[in-house]
Regions:
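A short beta-turn/loop motif at secondary-structure boundaries
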Residues: 43-46, 199-201
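Conserved catalytic-core motifs of GNAT/GCN5-like acyltransferases
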Residues: 36-43
Length: 218
């Protein structure tokens, strides 16, 4: 009997950096990396807007902030952006708060993950259409260490529209008070090799980037 190679349910799609304002986030990334983020657009359903940097084929860095011209949604915004404590931290500097993994079968991936990822919602920005997991309270799963899942429903990926940036991922790392649970969730999605996770009392996520200004850690 011929065995079928394991097909991961998900792969890295993008990193999420939050900022108090989008301008602050753009300036911060440009200053520490030497790479200018490109304009993204508005997420009307969430009252947020973003800017992007290409990191690799179909992989990008997203800078996101609450859109002051947008309408506050009736539900909690994604990525915990309504969290007062997070917003207080963002006044110090923009921060890497989460990551998003891409799948071609989001319902199956959600069912396969031992950590609840939230409900699946349909979203749009410009020509892009996608489905994404969002917990009811907006807080990222696993304190930000377990990824949100996304399934793009159009052929064009956001990174395909961005210029090459001379910036790429050197590595990712995470810590969590219960790393075994996190490792099990990542393994269920086929992501165990993407994000090495160790023990710490406080959950945290780090991304090391090759940039024109050397290795930069977010």
């Amino acid at each position: 009997m011929v065995s079928t190679p394991f097909q991961p349910l998900a792969t890295l799609d993008h990193l999420v950096v939050a900022a108090t304002t989008l301008a602050d986030g753009i300036d911060y990334i440009a200053e520490i990396t030497g790479v200018a983020p490109q304009p993204g657009g508005k997420h009307v359903a969430m009252g947020t807007h973003n800017a992007l940097v290409r990191l690799a084929e179909q992989v990008f860095l997203e800078i996101i902030a609450i859109d002051p011209a947008g309408v506050k949604p009736a539900r909690a915004r994604w990525f915990d952006l309504d969290n007062i404590a997070l917003q207080a931290e963002l006044t110090e500097r923009p921060r890497l708060i989460h990551w998003v993994a891409r799948t071609t079968d989001i319902e199956r991936a959600v069912a396969h993950c031992p950590i609840p990822l939230g409900n699946v919602y349909s979203m749009a920005r410009g020509h892009f259409r996608w489905r994404i997991t969002i917990p009811d309270d907006g807080a990222p799963p696993g304190k930000g260490v377990v990824p949100t899942l996304i399934q793009w429903d159009v052929p064009l990926h956001p990174a395909d529209t961005l210029p090459k940036s001379n910036m790429s991922i050197a590595g990712l790392a995470a810590a969590h008070p219960d790393p075994g649970v996190i490792r099990a969730a990542l393994a269920a999605l086929g992501l165990e090799g993407v994000l090495p996770t160790t023990y710490d009392r406080d959950a945290r996520l780090a991304a090391m980037l090759h940039t024109p200004r050397g290795i930069v850690t977010l």
